[in-house]
């Protein structure tokens, strides 16, 4: 018999790959000290036709990747009925009731399918990158089915009972996970025809079957993405109809033999962009016959043409003034949007990232990795639901579950919490799916009536320099200028205002903190944080350049610690008034990652606030354990005599915060916001002029400054 030895399992090697010795093979997921030097051998760094060879430079042993593919999909709550034995699905019941509370339970089947398709995209990229990488000769996929422990990791394409979830077939799975796999090195799935006359795609073969392949020809064809229709019923998503299109381009690669090996070049596919119609979705299909069976793989493409997208005549301002029926006004300023809507105009409102409420977290294209209880983040993603049959997407190709053409569009967008509007009167055109531990009901693009005005609102940056952003904006504007733009739901401007918040208010106020090491909490960014250690209470002073009417404080806990380290519980806030400190609020908070808005007993006119953290949800300097109380999880002091295992677990007294912002009185906040808009206008005026010159039937935003002045 043969015995194989390895020196460790799973965790990163604390050395460069060429320094690893004394083993028969290497099993890990990261080399070197952290990411550099060396690096990861799983995840996005090897995607888009790449690989992980730099992470394995000069290694002497074959490598197996540890726990690849921990991408999650949303839970199907029908699985609850399968638990008929001793194990009770309490976790799924909690997730279901959270979904019910956030008004998304009725979308469960859509969430399952669309998040599942997003999960499959990630798994395909991970596995193909693994197969493209020299020296990697295997992987441990975590897992084929859902894992119920450690926070509930819904990482499987099968449910906890090893049953199919219904969003990927065995044949599709074998395309990228089989003994023989066809691979392509595709740098981007979104192609700008104006900048690429020809696309070259190297094809490789990874083959570990029973015998080598002899005299094999590989065939390829580029076809328009088939149009698929589904219905949702009692048993989930059911295919109604799929309409396939004839190939646009096709060809055959040179006949070759393939050994039992990977990284075997099969040749190159060349796509002439002149032969391909833009603003369409395509599928590249590559296939061959291997030992009596057909081996096939497919990849999506979205073709755009930036030269045609930019060929838009300047706006006819006189027509815009006299014929408002077809005029569309574009703005990123809330007061300008309000004025236009009050006048009955059609408005595309692009809400900037930094002007969005802290109740609206960023959206992430990649799904949660393992789960957010073990690895919490402010930004989360589980795929999306798109009303792809809506006329707003008439010239922007998309399926209902999205695709790679959305990646750059949503990565820097905030999910607008439409549940905060207090009504269900919007048409949600692009809905990101939130992770099941939070279940926020959100939107990236929606339409509604506001008074007599018609609003299309988005948190997507449509001004970014990508062909897909230009194509989406053009498609939206074409719809908004048409007679079809008749939003049905009515929403008040006051309701919409719940989505706005000045994230950089402390910068506008010139706020400083008396300890520079704590300044991270004043940057307005919940993805950074400050951390104090020592002993309670912790006090610090925030001072502004001049006095303001202050009505409260916004506090956001640290967003990325699984144990809510340093999360504030009890506090005292004082203001410097008449040369003395005056208490303006004192109290306790509940435990959650949500922003906490602490209203003062009354508004104060001051330039100094003293913030004191009296204690947090952590036991002060004691051996501890975690316990659930009605208002959150607490670290409680442990009896180390009765429980010796707790001995030595001595946490420090820690206070942390990701954001501490002053809340201004309403009138003062409006003044600061308008001043900020003027400054932004002056900085971007020249860029705005150029943008306006390229928009058809759009009234220039240059007038917004004058309107705000008034």
Predicted stretch roles:
Residues 1-159:
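Substrate-binding/catalytic cleft of secreted carbohydrate-active enzymes
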Residues 39-47, 353-358, 370-468, 484-490, ...:
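Catalytic beta-strand/loop cores that center a nucleophilic Ser/Cys/Thr
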Residues 142-209, 657-658, 663, 674:
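Aromatic-rich peripheral "rim/lid" segments of glycoside hydrolase catalytic domains that contact
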Residues 197-256, 266-272, 280-289:
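Beta-strand-rich binding/interaction modules
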Residues 293-310:
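Short beta-strand elements
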Residues 323-371, 452, 476-479, 710:
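Short alpha-beta junction capping motif
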Residues 490, 494-550, 558-571, 579-580, ...:
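Disordered, acidic Ser/Thr/Pro-rich linker "stalks" and the adjacent N-terminal cap
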Residues 612-619:
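Short beta-strand-plus-loop segments that form exposed binding edges in beta-rich domains
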């Amino acid at each position: 018999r043969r015995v194989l030895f390895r020196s460790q399992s799973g965790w990163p090697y604390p050395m460069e790959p060429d320094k690893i010795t004394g083993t028969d093979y290497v099993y890990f997921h990261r080399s070197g000290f952290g990411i550099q030097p060396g690096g990861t051998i799983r995840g996005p760094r090897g995607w888009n036709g790449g690989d992980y060879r730099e992470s394995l430079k000069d290694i002497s042993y074959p490598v197996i990747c540890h726990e690849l593919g921990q991408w999650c999909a949303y839970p199907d709550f029908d699985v609850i009925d399968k638990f008929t034995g001793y194990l009770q699905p309490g976790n799924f019941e909690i997730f279901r009731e959270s979904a019910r509370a956030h008004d998304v339970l009725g979308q469960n089947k859509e969430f399952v399918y669309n998040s599942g398709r997003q999960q499959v995209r990630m798994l395909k990229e991970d596995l193909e990158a693994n197969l493209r990488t020299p020296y990697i000769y295997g992987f441990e996929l975590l897992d084929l089915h859902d894992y119920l422990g450690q926070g509930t990791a819904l990482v499987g394409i099968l449910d906890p009972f090893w049953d199919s979830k219904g969003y990927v077939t065995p044949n599709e799975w074998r395309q990228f996970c089989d003994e023989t796999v066809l691979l392509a090195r595709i740098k981007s799935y979104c192609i700008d025809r104006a900048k690429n006359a020809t696309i070259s795609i190297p094809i490789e073969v990874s083959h570990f079957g029973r015998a080598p392949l002899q005299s094999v020809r590989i065939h390829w064809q580029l076809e328009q993405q088939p149009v698929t229709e589904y219905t949702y019923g009692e048993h989930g998503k059911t295919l109604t109809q799929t309409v396939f299109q004839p190939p646009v381009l096709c060809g055959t690669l040179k006949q070759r033999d393939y050994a039992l090996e990977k990284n075997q070049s099969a040749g190159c596919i060349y796509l002439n962009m002149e032969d391909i119609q833009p603003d369409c979705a395509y599928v590249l299909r590559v296939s061959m016959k291997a030992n009596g069976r057909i081996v096939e793989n497919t990849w999506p493409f979205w073709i755009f043409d930036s030269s045609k997208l930019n060929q838009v005549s300047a706006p006819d301002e006189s027509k815009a003034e006299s014929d408002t029926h077809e005029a569309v006004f574009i703005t990123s300023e809330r007061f300008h949007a309000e004025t236009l809507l009050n006048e009955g105009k059609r408005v595309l409102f692009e809400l900037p990232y930094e002007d969005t409420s802290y109740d609206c977290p960023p959206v992430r294209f990649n799904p949660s990795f393992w789960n957010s209880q073990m690895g919490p983040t402010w930004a989360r993603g589980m795929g999306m639901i798109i009303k792809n049959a809506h006329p707003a997407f008439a010239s922007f190709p998309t399926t209902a579950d999205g695709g790679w053409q959305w990646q750059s569009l949503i990565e820097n967008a905030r999910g607008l919490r439409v549940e905060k509007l207090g009504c269900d009167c919007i048409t949600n055109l692009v809905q990101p799916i939130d992770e099941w531990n939070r279940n926020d009901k959100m939107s990236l693009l929606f339409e509604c009536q506001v008074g007599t005005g018609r609003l299309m609102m988005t948190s997507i940056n449509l001004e970014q320099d990508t062909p897909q952003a230009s194509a989406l904006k053009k498609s939206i504007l074409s719809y908004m200028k048409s007679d079809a733009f008749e939003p049905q739901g009515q929403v008040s401007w006051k309701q919409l205002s719940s989505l706005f918040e000045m994230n950089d208010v402390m910068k506008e106020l010139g706020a400083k903190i008396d300890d520079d090491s704590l300044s991270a909490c004043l940057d307005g960014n919940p993805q950074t944080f400050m951390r104090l250690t020592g002993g309670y209470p912790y006090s610090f002073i925030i001072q502004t350049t001049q006095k303001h009417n202050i009505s409260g404080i916004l506090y956001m806990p640290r967003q990325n610690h699984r144990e809510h380290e340093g999360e504030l519980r009890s506090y005292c806030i004082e203001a410097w008034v008449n040369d003395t400190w005056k208490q303006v609020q004192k109290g306790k908070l509940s435990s959650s990652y949500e922003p906490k808005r602490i209203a003062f007993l009354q508004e104060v006119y001051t330039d100094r606030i003293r913030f004191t953290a009296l204690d947090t949800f952590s036991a002060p300097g004691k051996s501890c354990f975690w316990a659930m109380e009605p208002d959150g999880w607490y670290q409680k002091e442990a009896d180390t005599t009765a429980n010796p295992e707790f001995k030595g677990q001595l946490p420090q007294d820690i206070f942390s915060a990701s954001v501490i912002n002053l809340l201004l009185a309403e009138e003062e906040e409006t003044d600061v916001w308008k001043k900020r808009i003027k400054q932004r206008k002056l900085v971007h005026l020249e860029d705005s002029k150029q943008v306006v010159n390229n928009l058809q039937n759009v009234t220039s935003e240059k007038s917004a400054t004058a309107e705000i002045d008034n």
